[in-house]
Curated annotation (Swiss-Prot):
Source lineage: Bacteria, Pseudomonadati, Pseudomonadota, Gammaproteobacteria, Pseudomonadales
Protein known as: Probable protein kinase UbiB
CDD domains: UbiB
Recorded family membership: Belongs to the ABC1 family. UbiB subfamily.
Functional summary from the UniProt entry: Is probably a protein kinase regulator of UbiI activity which is involved in aerobic coenzyme Q (ubiquinone) biosynthesis.
Length: 539
Protein backbone atom coordinates (compact mmCIF):
# COMPACT_ATOMS: atom_id res chain seq x y z
CA UNK A 1 0.00 0.00 0.00
CA UNK A 2 2.85 2.39 0.86
CA UNK A 3 4.52 1.61 -2.48
CA UNK A 4 1.26 2.42 -4.28
CA UNK A 5 0.99 5.70 -2.37
CA UNK A 6 4.55 6.69 -3.34
CA UNK A 7 3.89 5.82 -6.98
CA UNK A 8 0.71 7.91 -6.86
CA UNK A 9 2.67 10.83 -5.40
CA UNK A 10 5.17 10.72 -8.27
CA UNK A 11 2.27 10.51 -10.73
CA UNK A 12 0.70 13.67 -9.24
CA UNK A 13 4.08 15.42 -9.35
CA UNK A 14 4.57 14.57 -13.04
CA UNK A 15 1.12 15.92 -13.90
CA UNK A 16 1.76 19.12 -11.93
CA UNK A 17 5.00 19.68 -13.86
CA UNK A 18 3.51 18.78 -17.24
CA UNK A 19 0.68 21.31 -16.95
CA UNK A 20 2.78 23.90 -15.10
CA UNK A 21 0.42 23.99 -12.15
CA UNK A 22 3.42 24.99 -10.01
CA UNK A 23 3.29 28.36 -11.80
CA UNK A 24 -0.28 28.81 -10.59
CA UNK A 25 0.77 27.88 -7.06
CA UNK A 26 3.65 30.34 -6.87
CA UNK A 27 1.50 33.12 -8.31
CA UNK A 28 -0.40 33.09 -5.00
CA UNK A 29 0.65 35.43 -2.15
CA UNK A 30 2.58 32.74 -0.24
CA UNK A 31 4.94 33.27 2.72
CA UNK A 32 8.58 33.92 1.72
CA UNK A 33 9.78 30.57 3.04
CA UNK A 34 7.30 28.72 0.80
CA UNK A 35 8.11 30.84 -2.24
CA UNK A 36 11.79 30.06 -1.73
CA UNK A 37 11.02 26.34 -2.18
CA UNK A 38 10.87 26.91 -5.93
CA UNK A 39 14.69 27.11 -5.82
CA UNK A 40 14.75 23.46 -4.72
CA UNK A 41 12.67 22.29 -7.69
CA UNK A 42 15.16 21.12 -10.34
CA UNK A 43 12.75 21.34 -13.26
CA UNK A 44 12.36 25.08 -12.67
CA UNK A 45 16.03 25.56 -13.65
CA UNK A 46 15.38 24.00 -17.04
CA UNK A 47 14.11 26.04 -20.00
CA UNK A 48 10.36 25.50 -20.42
CA UNK A 49 8.10 26.67 -23.20
CA UNK A 50 5.40 29.01 -21.87
CA UNK A 51 2.01 27.34 -21.94
CA UNK A 52 -0.51 28.74 -24.40
CA UNK A 53 -3.36 27.23 -22.40
CA UNK A 54 -5.34 29.21 -19.85
CA UNK A 55 -4.98 28.35 -16.17
CA UNK A 56 -8.45 26.79 -16.17
CA UNK A 57 -7.63 24.57 -19.15
CA UNK A 58 -4.37 23.43 -17.54
CA UNK A 59 -6.19 22.51 -14.34
CA UNK A 60 -8.90 20.65 -16.26
CA UNK A 61 -6.39 18.63 -18.29
CA UNK A 62 -4.40 17.82 -15.15
CA UNK A 63 -7.51 16.48 -13.39
CA UNK A 64 -8.35 14.39 -16.47
CA UNK A 65 -4.85 12.89 -16.43
CA UNK A 66 -5.10 12.03 -12.73
CA UNK A 67 -8.10 9.80 -13.31
CA UNK A 68 -11.78 9.40 -12.41
CA UNK A 69 -11.62 10.35 -8.72
CA UNK A 70 -9.93 13.66 -9.53
CA UNK A 71 -12.30 14.19 -12.47
CA UNK A 72 -15.33 13.86 -10.21
CA UNK A 73 -13.68 16.18 -7.70
CA UNK A 74 -13.23 18.74 -10.49
CA UNK A 75 -16.90 18.37 -11.40
CA UNK A 76 -17.82 19.09 -7.79
CA UNK A 77 -15.52 22.13 -7.78
CA UNK A 78 -17.24 23.45 -10.91
CA UNK A 79 -20.47 23.82 -8.91
CA UNK A 80 -18.77 26.06 -6.33
CA UNK A 81 -18.98 29.25 -8.34
CA UNK A 82 -19.38 31.15 -5.09
CA UNK A 83 -15.74 30.24 -4.38
CA UNK A 84 -13.92 29.78 -7.70
CA UNK A 85 -12.96 32.35 -10.34
CA UNK A 86 -15.37 32.21 -13.28
CA UNK A 87 -12.73 31.18 -15.86
CA UNK A 88 -11.72 28.13 -13.80
CA UNK A 89 -15.31 27.11 -13.00
CA UNK A 90 -16.25 27.33 -16.71
CA UNK A 91 -13.35 25.06 -17.70
CA UNK A 92 -14.12 22.51 -14.98
CA UNK A 93 -17.70 22.30 -16.29
CA UNK A 94 -16.20 20.66 -19.41
CA UNK A 95 -14.89 17.66 -17.46
CA UNK A 96 -16.47 14.43 -18.70
CA UNK A 97 -16.84 11.42 -16.42
CA UNK A 98 -16.10 8.84 -19.11
CA UNK A 99 -13.68 5.97 -18.54
CA UNK A 100 -13.10 2.68 -20.38
CA UNK A 101 -15.49 -0.12 -19.32
CA UNK A 102 -14.23 -2.85 -17.05
CA UNK A 103 -14.26 -6.54 -18.01
CA UNK A 104 -17.87 -7.78 -18.48
CA UNK A 105 -16.85 -11.03 -16.75
CA UNK A 106 -16.18 -9.00 -13.61
CA UNK A 107 -19.61 -7.38 -13.95
CA UNK A 108 -21.33 -10.76 -14.29
CA UNK A 109 -19.40 -12.18 -11.32
CA UNK A 110 -20.33 -9.19 -9.16
CA UNK A 111 -24.02 -9.40 -10.13
CA UNK A 112 -24.13 -13.10 -9.34
CA UNK A 113 -22.40 -12.65 -5.97
CA UNK A 114 -24.78 -9.82 -5.03
CA UNK A 115 -27.98 -11.55 -6.18
CA UNK A 116 -26.96 -15.04 -5.09
CA UNK A 117 -28.05 -16.49 -8.44
CA UNK A 118 -26.71 -17.01 -11.94
CA UNK A 119 -27.35 -14.21 -14.43
CA UNK A 120 -29.21 -16.70 -16.65
CA UNK A 121 -31.55 -17.53 -13.77
CA UNK A 122 -32.54 -13.89 -13.27
CA UNK A 123 -32.48 -12.49 -16.82
CA UNK A 124 -33.67 -14.01 -20.08
CA UNK A 125 -31.12 -11.78 -21.83
CA UNK A 126 -28.06 -9.93 -20.54
CA UNK A 127 -25.93 -7.78 -22.85
CA UNK A 128 -22.27 -8.11 -21.88
CA UNK A 129 -21.41 -5.00 -23.91
CA UNK A 130 -22.15 -2.05 -21.57
CA UNK A 131 -24.45 0.78 -22.62
CA UNK A 132 -22.35 3.31 -20.70
CA UNK A 133 -19.33 3.39 -18.42
CA UNK A 134 -18.33 5.98 -15.82
CA UNK A 135 -15.88 6.27 -12.94
CA UNK A 136 -18.15 4.69 -10.31
CA UNK A 137 -20.27 2.21 -12.29
CA UNK A 138 -21.25 0.90 -15.69
CA UNK A 139 -24.64 0.00 -17.13
CA UNK A 140 -25.77 -3.12 -19.03
CA UNK A 141 -29.04 -3.76 -20.87
CA UNK A 142 -31.04 -6.86 -19.93
CA UNK A 143 -34.49 -8.46 -20.03
CA UNK A 144 -36.23 -10.03 -17.05
CA UNK A 145 -37.73 -13.51 -17.18
CA UNK A 146 -41.14 -11.80 -17.05
CA UNK A 147 -40.34 -9.85 -20.24
CA UNK A 148 -39.60 -6.34 -18.93
CA UNK A 149 -36.67 -4.47 -20.51
CA UNK A 150 -34.31 -3.22 -17.80
CA UNK A 151 -30.87 -1.73 -17.24
CA UNK A 152 -28.43 -3.16 -14.70
CA UNK A 153 -26.04 -0.75 -13.02
CA UNK A 154 -22.93 -2.34 -11.49
CA UNK A 155 -20.37 -0.64 -9.22
CA UNK A 156 -16.82 -0.76 -10.56
CA UNK A 157 -14.89 -3.44 -8.61
CA UNK A 158 -11.91 -2.56 -6.42
CA UNK A 159 -12.88 1.09 -6.23
CA UNK A 160 -12.80 1.75 -2.48
CA UNK A 161 -9.00 1.45 -2.00
CA UNK A 162 -8.42 3.77 -4.99
CA UNK A 163 -10.89 6.31 -3.61
CA UNK A 164 -9.35 6.15 -0.12
CA UNK A 165 -5.86 6.71 -1.51
CA UNK A 166 -6.82 9.63 -3.75
CA UNK A 167 -8.91 11.21 -0.99
CA UNK A 168 -5.92 11.01 1.35
CA UNK A 169 -3.85 12.99 -1.16
CA UNK A 170 -6.66 15.49 -1.72
CA UNK A 171 -6.96 16.07 2.04
CA UNK A 172 -3.18 16.47 2.31
CA UNK A 173 -3.13 19.04 -0.51
CA UNK A 174 -6.13 20.88 0.99
CA UNK A 175 -4.60 21.05 4.48
CA UNK A 176 -1.29 22.26 3.05
CA UNK A 177 -3.09 24.97 1.06
CA UNK A 178 -4.98 26.16 4.15
CA UNK A 179 -1.76 26.46 6.14
CA UNK A 180 0.15 28.19 3.36
CA UNK A 181 -2.26 30.83 2.08
CA UNK A 182 -4.91 33.15 3.51
CA UNK A 183 -6.62 33.14 0.09
CA UNK A 184 -6.78 29.35 0.21
CA UNK A 185 -8.25 29.42 3.72
CA UNK A 186 -11.02 31.67 2.44
CA UNK A 187 -11.97 28.90 -0.03
CA UNK A 188 -12.26 26.26 2.75
CA UNK A 189 -10.47 23.50 0.76
CA UNK A 190 -10.64 20.90 3.56
CA UNK A 191 -14.39 21.44 3.84
CA UNK A 192 -14.78 21.03 0.07
CA UNK A 193 -12.83 17.76 0.07
CA UNK A 194 -14.94 16.60 3.02
CA UNK A 195 -18.13 17.27 1.02
CA UNK A 196 -16.66 15.35 -1.90
CA UNK A 197 -15.76 12.41 0.35
CA UNK A 198 -19.39 12.10 1.45
CA UNK A 199 -20.68 12.46 -2.11
CA UNK A 200 -18.37 9.84 -3.63
CA UNK A 201 -19.03 7.26 -0.92
CA UNK A 202 -22.78 7.87 -1.20
CA UNK A 203 -22.56 7.12 -4.93
CA UNK A 204 -21.02 3.72 -4.15
CA UNK A 205 -24.24 2.65 -2.40
CA UNK A 206 -26.73 1.86 -5.15
CA UNK A 207 -29.49 1.17 -2.62
CA UNK A 208 -29.35 4.87 -1.78
CA UNK A 209 -29.75 5.74 -5.46
CA UNK A 210 -32.64 3.28 -5.74
CA UNK A 211 -34.39 4.93 -2.78
CA UNK A 212 -33.88 8.38 -4.32
CA UNK A 213 -35.33 7.20 -7.65
CA UNK A 214 -38.35 5.65 -5.92
CA UNK A 215 -39.03 8.88 -4.03
CA UNK A 216 -38.80 10.99 -7.21
CA UNK A 217 -41.00 8.55 -9.09
CA UNK A 218 -43.63 8.72 -6.35
CA UNK A 219 -43.46 12.54 -6.30
CA UNK A 220 -44.14 12.74 -10.06
CA UNK A 221 -46.59 9.83 -10.28
CA UNK A 222 -49.20 10.73 -12.91
CA UNK A 223 -47.50 14.06 -13.74
CA UNK A 224 -47.09 15.30 -17.31
CA UNK A 225 -43.91 17.14 -16.30
CA UNK A 226 -41.45 14.31 -15.64
CA UNK A 227 -41.22 10.53 -15.61
CA UNK A 228 -38.80 8.51 -13.46
CA UNK A 229 -38.15 4.82 -14.33
CA UNK A 230 -39.38 2.07 -12.03
CA UNK A 231 -36.95 0.43 -9.61
CA UNK A 232 -37.05 -3.37 -9.27
CA UNK A 233 -36.36 -3.56 -5.55
CA UNK A 234 -36.17 -7.35 -5.33
CA UNK A 235 -33.10 -7.22 -7.63
CA UNK A 236 -31.34 -4.24 -5.99
CA UNK A 237 -28.30 -4.63 -3.78
CA UNK A 238 -25.59 -2.22 -2.51
CA UNK A 239 -23.52 -2.81 -5.68
CA UNK A 240 -26.27 -3.67 -8.18
CA UNK A 241 -29.27 -1.59 -9.29
CA UNK A 242 -31.97 -2.83 -11.69
CA UNK A 243 -34.33 -0.27 -13.24
CA UNK A 244 -36.84 -0.03 -16.05
CA UNK A 245 -35.16 0.75 -19.37
CA UNK A 246 -36.44 3.94 -20.94
CA UNK A 247 -36.50 4.94 -24.60
CA UNK A 248 -36.40 8.67 -25.12
CA UNK A 249 -34.61 11.36 -27.09
CA UNK A 250 -31.52 12.86 -25.44
CA UNK A 251 -32.49 16.39 -24.49
CA UNK A 252 -29.50 17.76 -26.44
CA UNK A 253 -30.57 16.03 -29.69
CA UNK A 254 -32.21 19.12 -31.17
CA UNK A 255 -32.53 17.64 -34.66
CA UNK A 256 -34.61 14.65 -33.53
CA UNK A 257 -36.74 16.82 -31.24
CA UNK A 258 -37.40 19.17 -34.16
CA UNK A 259 -38.18 16.27 -36.54
CA UNK A 260 -40.91 14.98 -34.23
CA UNK A 261 -42.28 18.55 -33.90
CA UNK A 262 -41.69 18.86 -30.19
CA UNK A 263 -43.12 22.01 -28.61
CA UNK A 264 -39.73 23.44 -27.59
CA UNK A 265 -41.15 26.48 -25.78
CA UNK A 266 -43.39 24.30 -23.62
CA UNK A 267 -40.54 21.84 -23.04
CA UNK A 268 -38.26 24.64 -21.81
CA UNK A 269 -40.97 26.08 -19.55
CA UNK A 270 -41.73 22.66 -18.12
CA UNK A 271 -38.07 22.29 -17.20
CA UNK A 272 -38.39 25.41 -15.04
CA UNK A 273 -41.63 24.08 -13.58
CA UNK A 274 -39.97 20.74 -12.79
CA UNK A 275 -37.26 22.56 -10.85
CA UNK A 276 -39.61 24.72 -8.79
CA UNK A 277 -42.01 21.83 -8.19
CA UNK A 278 -39.20 19.70 -6.79
CA UNK A 279 -37.79 22.49 -4.62
CA UNK A 280 -40.99 24.05 -3.26
CA UNK A 281 -43.68 21.34 -3.54
CA UNK A 282 -41.67 18.22 -2.78
CA UNK A 283 -38.63 19.68 -0.97
CA UNK A 284 -36.66 16.89 -2.68
CA UNK A 285 -34.84 17.54 -5.94
CA UNK A 286 -32.68 15.70 -8.46
CA UNK A 287 -29.33 17.48 -8.05
CA UNK A 288 -27.51 16.02 -11.06
CA UNK A 289 -29.75 17.16 -13.92
CA UNK A 290 -27.05 17.64 -16.54
CA UNK A 291 -28.01 16.84 -20.17
CA UNK A 292 -26.62 13.29 -19.98
CA UNK A 293 -29.23 12.39 -17.35
CA UNK A 294 -32.25 13.95 -19.06
CA UNK A 295 -34.32 12.55 -21.95
CA UNK A 296 -37.58 13.56 -23.61
CA UNK A 297 -40.48 11.15 -24.13
CA UNK A 298 -41.50 10.53 -27.74
CA UNK A 299 -45.14 9.75 -26.86
CA UNK A 300 -46.70 13.25 -27.03
CA UNK A 301 -44.38 15.79 -28.70
CA UNK A 302 -47.09 18.49 -28.45
CA UNK A 303 -47.10 17.97 -24.66
CA UNK A 304 -43.48 16.88 -24.03
CA UNK A 305 -42.49 15.07 -20.86
CA UNK A 306 -39.00 14.83 -19.36
CA UNK A 307 -37.46 11.50 -18.31
CA UNK A 308 -34.85 11.63 -15.54
CA UNK A 309 -32.26 8.96 -14.73
CA UNK A 310 -29.25 8.63 -12.39
CA UNK A 311 -30.64 9.80 -9.05
CA UNK A 312 -27.43 9.28 -7.08
CA UNK A 313 -27.24 12.93 -6.00
CA UNK A 314 -30.33 14.61 -4.56
CA UNK A 315 -30.97 17.63 -2.36
CA UNK A 316 -33.66 18.79 0.03
CA UNK A 317 -34.57 22.01 1.80
CA UNK A 318 -36.12 22.60 5.20
CA UNK A 319 -39.43 24.46 5.37
CA UNK A 320 -37.53 27.49 6.70
CA UNK A 321 -35.03 27.41 3.81
CA UNK A 322 -37.88 27.08 1.30
CA UNK A 323 -39.59 30.12 2.80
CA UNK A 324 -36.46 32.28 2.87
CA UNK A 325 -35.44 31.23 -0.65
CA UNK A 326 -38.86 32.13 -2.09
CA UNK A 327 -38.89 35.47 -0.28
CA UNK A 328 -35.32 36.17 -1.44
CA UNK A 329 -36.13 35.53 -5.09
CA UNK A 330 -39.28 37.67 -4.98
CA UNK A 331 -37.42 40.48 -3.18
CA UNK A 332 -34.56 40.25 -5.69
CA UNK A 333 -36.76 40.75 -8.70
CA UNK A 334 -38.45 43.66 -6.96
CA UNK A 335 -34.93 45.07 -6.36
CA UNK A 336 -35.70 45.22 -2.65
CA UNK A 337 -32.08 44.66 -1.59
CA UNK A 338 -32.68 45.66 2.01
CA UNK A 339 -35.27 42.90 2.33
CA UNK A 340 -32.78 40.43 0.83
CA UNK A 341 -30.16 41.46 3.40
CA UNK A 342 -32.66 41.21 6.27
CA UNK A 343 -33.79 37.75 5.14
CA UNK A 344 -30.21 36.49 5.11
CA UNK A 345 -29.68 37.71 8.66
CA UNK A 346 -33.07 36.47 9.93
CA UNK A 347 -32.45 33.02 8.47
CA UNK A 348 -29.05 32.72 10.15
CA UNK A 349 -27.30 32.35 6.77
CA UNK A 350 -25.05 35.26 7.78
CA UNK A 351 -24.11 36.23 11.36
CA UNK A 352 -26.65 38.21 13.40
CA UNK A 353 -24.15 41.03 14.00
CA UNK A 354 -23.90 41.77 10.24
CA UNK A 355 -24.61 45.43 9.46
CA UNK A 356 -27.72 45.51 7.31
CA UNK A 357 -26.78 48.75 5.53
CA UNK A 358 -23.36 47.44 4.47
CA UNK A 359 -24.77 44.10 3.33
CA UNK A 360 -27.57 45.84 1.40
CA UNK A 361 -25.06 48.11 -0.36
CA UNK A 362 -22.87 45.14 -1.35
CA UNK A 363 -25.85 43.27 -2.80
CA UNK A 364 -27.00 46.36 -4.72
CA UNK A 365 -23.53 46.91 -6.20
CA UNK A 366 -23.36 43.36 -7.50
CA UNK A 367 -26.94 42.94 -8.70
CA UNK A 368 -27.93 46.26 -10.26
CA UNK A 369 -25.89 45.56 -13.44
CA UNK A 370 -27.77 42.26 -13.82
CA UNK A 371 -31.17 43.95 -13.77
CA UNK A 372 -30.21 46.41 -16.49
CA UNK A 373 -30.79 43.53 -18.92
CA UNK A 374 -34.23 42.47 -20.20
CA UNK A 375 -35.85 39.95 -17.85
CA UNK A 376 -35.62 37.19 -20.45
CA UNK A 377 -31.82 37.60 -20.49
CA UNK A 378 -31.39 37.46 -16.72
CA UNK A 379 -29.94 34.23 -15.37
CA UNK A 380 -31.56 32.94 -12.17
CA UNK A 381 -28.48 30.84 -11.53
CA UNK A 382 -26.19 33.86 -11.96
CA UNK A 383 -28.35 35.83 -9.51
CA UNK A 384 -27.97 33.10 -6.89
CA UNK A 385 -24.26 32.78 -7.61
CA UNK A 386 -23.68 36.53 -7.20
CA UNK A 387 -25.73 36.47 -4.02
CA UNK A 388 -23.69 33.61 -2.54
CA UNK A 389 -20.41 35.28 -3.55
CA UNK A 390 -21.45 38.50 -1.84
CA UNK A 391 -22.74 36.70 1.25
CA UNK A 392 -19.44 34.82 1.57
CA UNK A 393 -17.71 38.17 2.10
CA UNK A 394 -20.00 38.62 5.09
CA UNK A 395 -19.06 35.20 6.55
CA UNK A 396 -22.02 33.25 5.22
CA UNK A 397 -21.74 29.62 6.26
CA UNK A 398 -21.61 27.13 3.40
CA UNK A 399 -25.10 25.70 2.84
CA UNK A 400 -24.54 22.38 1.00
CA UNK A 401 -28.17 22.06 -0.08
CA UNK A 402 -28.21 25.61 -1.48
CA UNK A 403 -25.02 24.87 -3.42
CA UNK A 404 -26.70 21.79 -4.93
CA UNK A 405 -29.76 23.88 -5.69
CA UNK A 406 -27.71 26.55 -7.46
CA UNK A 407 -25.95 23.88 -9.55
CA UNK A 408 -29.30 22.31 -10.48
CA UNK A 409 -30.79 25.67 -11.40
CA UNK A 410 -27.82 26.49 -13.63
CA UNK A 411 -28.24 23.13 -15.40
CA UNK A 412 -32.00 23.58 -15.88
CA UNK A 413 -31.60 27.17 -17.00
CA UNK A 414 -28.84 26.39 -19.49
CA UNK A 415 -30.86 23.51 -20.85
CA UNK A 416 -34.01 25.63 -21.15
CA UNK A 417 -32.22 28.41 -23.04
CA UNK A 418 -30.65 25.82 -25.35
CA UNK A 419 -34.12 24.44 -26.15
CA UNK A 420 -35.78 27.84 -26.44
CA UNK A 421 -33.40 30.85 -26.48
CA UNK A 422 -36.16 33.36 -25.60
CA UNK A 423 -37.12 31.51 -22.41
CA UNK A 424 -38.15 34.03 -19.72
CA UNK A 425 -37.57 32.19 -16.47
CA UNK A 426 -39.06 34.91 -14.32
CA UNK A 427 -42.42 34.96 -16.14
CA UNK A 428 -42.62 31.19 -15.56
CA UNK A 429 -41.32 31.21 -11.98
CA UNK A 430 -43.03 34.31 -10.56
CA UNK A 431 -46.64 32.99 -10.68
CA UNK A 432 -45.43 29.68 -9.21
CA UNK A 433 -43.64 31.38 -6.29
CA UNK A 434 -46.48 33.81 -5.57
CA UNK A 435 -49.05 30.98 -5.64
CA UNK A 436 -46.83 28.90 -3.35
CA UNK A 437 -46.49 31.78 -0.88
CA UNK A 438 -50.28 32.32 -0.83
CA UNK A 439 -50.89 28.63 -0.19
CA UNK A 440 -48.21 28.48 2.48
CA UNK A 441 -49.84 31.27 4.48
CA UNK A 442 -53.45 30.35 3.81
CA UNK A 443 -55.71 29.72 6.86
CA UNK A 444 -55.67 25.99 6.07
CA UNK A 445 -51.85 25.86 6.02
CA UNK A 446 -51.58 27.96 9.18
CA UNK A 447 -54.01 25.66 10.99
CA UNK A 448 -52.02 22.63 9.85
CA UNK A 449 -48.83 24.24 11.14
CA UNK A 450 -50.46 24.98 14.50
CA UNK A 451 -51.68 21.38 14.67
CA UNK A 452 -48.18 20.01 14.01
CA UNK A 453 -46.76 22.25 16.74
CA UNK A 454 -49.49 21.09 19.12
CA UNK A 455 -48.15 17.55 18.69
CA UNK A 456 -45.07 18.73 20.60
CA UNK A 457 -47.12 19.58 23.70
CA UNK A 458 -46.60 16.16 25.38
CA UNK A 459 -42.84 16.84 25.25
CA UNK A 460 -43.17 20.41 26.55
CA UNK A 461 -42.09 19.66 30.11
CA UNK A 462 -38.89 17.90 29.02
CA UNK A 463 -38.09 20.59 26.44
CA UNK A 464 -38.60 23.32 29.04
CA UNK A 465 -36.29 21.60 31.53
CA UNK A 466 -33.56 21.06 28.91
CA UNK A 467 -33.82 24.63 27.67
CA UNK A 468 -33.65 26.11 31.19
CA UNK A 469 -30.60 23.96 31.96
CA UNK A 470 -28.84 25.27 28.85
CA UNK A 471 -29.78 28.88 29.57
CA UNK A 472 -28.47 28.53 33.13
CA UNK A 473 -24.96 27.86 31.83
CA UNK A 474 -23.13 31.18 31.50
CA UNK A 475 -20.83 30.08 28.68
CA UNK A 476 -23.82 29.77 26.39
CA UNK A 477 -24.13 33.55 26.44
CA UNK A 478 -20.54 34.01 25.28
CA UNK A 479 -20.71 36.20 22.12
CA UNK A 480 -18.00 34.03 20.56
CA UNK A 481 -20.34 31.01 20.41
CA UNK A 482 -21.09 29.74 16.91
CA UNK A 483 -24.00 31.60 15.39
CA UNK A 484 -25.71 28.36 14.49
CA UNK A 485 -26.12 27.34 18.13
CA UNK A 486 -27.61 30.71 19.06
CA UNK A 487 -29.94 30.46 16.08
CA UNK A 488 -31.00 27.04 17.36
CA UNK A 489 -31.76 28.55 20.78
CA UNK A 490 -33.96 31.18 19.15
CA UNK A 491 -35.93 28.53 17.29
CA UNK A 492 -36.24 26.47 20.47
CA UNK A 493 -37.64 29.48 22.33
CA UNK A 494 -40.09 30.14 19.50
CA UNK A 495 -41.24 26.53 19.64
CA UNK A 496 -41.58 26.74 23.42
CA UNK A 497 -43.64 29.91 23.02
CA UNK A 498 -45.91 28.20 20.50
CA UNK A 499 -46.31 25.26 22.88
CA UNK A 500 -47.22 27.56 25.78
CA UNK A 501 -49.75 29.37 23.60
CA UNK A 502 -51.31 26.09 22.53
CA UNK A 503 -51.38 24.73 26.07
CA UNK A 504 -52.84 27.98 27.40
CA UNK A 505 -55.56 27.89 24.76
CA UNK A 506 -56.50 24.32 25.73
CA UNK A 507 -56.63 25.22 29.44
CA UNK A 508 -58.62 28.38 28.70
CA UNK A 509 -61.16 26.39 26.72
CA UNK A 510 -61.49 23.89 29.58
CA UNK A 511 -61.90 26.69 32.13
CA UNK A 512 -64.52 28.36 29.95
CA UNK A 513 -66.59 25.20 29.98
CA UNK A 514 -66.31 24.84 33.76
CA UNK A 515 -66.76 28.45 34.84
CA UNK A 516 -65.59 31.93 33.87
CA UNK A 517 -62.18 32.92 32.51
CA UNK A 518 -62.02 35.44 35.34
CA UNK A 519 -62.28 32.67 37.92
CA UNK A 520 -59.18 31.77 40.02
CA UNK A 521 -58.99 28.35 38.35
CA UNK A 522 -58.20 30.05 35.02
CA UNK A 523 -54.96 31.74 36.12
CA UNK A 524 -52.63 28.96 34.75
CA UNK A 525 -54.20 29.45 31.31
CA UNK A 526 -53.61 33.21 31.39
CA UNK A 527 -50.04 32.69 32.60
CA UNK A 528 -49.23 30.22 29.82
CA UNK A 529 -50.81 32.46 27.16
CA UNK A 530 -48.87 35.50 28.37
CA UNK A 531 -45.57 33.59 28.58
CA UNK A 532 -46.03 32.06 25.13
CA UNK A 533 -46.90 35.40 23.55
CA UNK A 534 -43.90 37.05 25.20
CA UNK A 535 -41.45 34.39 23.95
CA UNK A 536 -42.72 34.53 20.37
CA UNK A 537 -42.70 38.34 20.20
CA UNK A 538 -39.33 38.55 21.98
CA UNK A 539 -37.68 36.14 19.54
Amino acid sequence: MKLLAVRRLFRIQRVVIRYRLDDLLFDLPLPWWLRSLRLLMPWRWLPRTPSELSRGARLRLALQDLGPIFIKFGQLLSTRRDLLPTDIADELMLLQDRVPPFDPKQAVALIESQLGAKVGEVFSRFDVEPLASASVAQVHAARLKTGEEVVVKVVRPGLKPVIAQDLAWLFLIAKGAERASADARRLHPVEIVGDYEKTIYDELDLLREAANASQLRRNFEGSELMYVPQVYWDLCRPKVLVMERIYGVPVTDMATLADQRTDMKLLAERGVEVFFTQVFRHSFFHADMHPGNIFVSTVKPWSPQYIAIDCGIVGSLTAEDQDYLARNLIAFFKRDYRRVAELHIDSGWVPAHTKVNEFEAAIRTVCEPIFEKPLKDISFGQVLMRLFQTARRFNMEVQPQLVLLQKTLLNIEGLGRQLYPDLDLWSTAKPFLERWMRERYSPKAMFGNLYSQAEQLPHLAGMTRDLLERLSQPHLHDPQLPERRRQGDRWALRLLGAGLLGGGAVLAASAAEAASLAAPAAWPAWLMLAAGLYLIVRQ
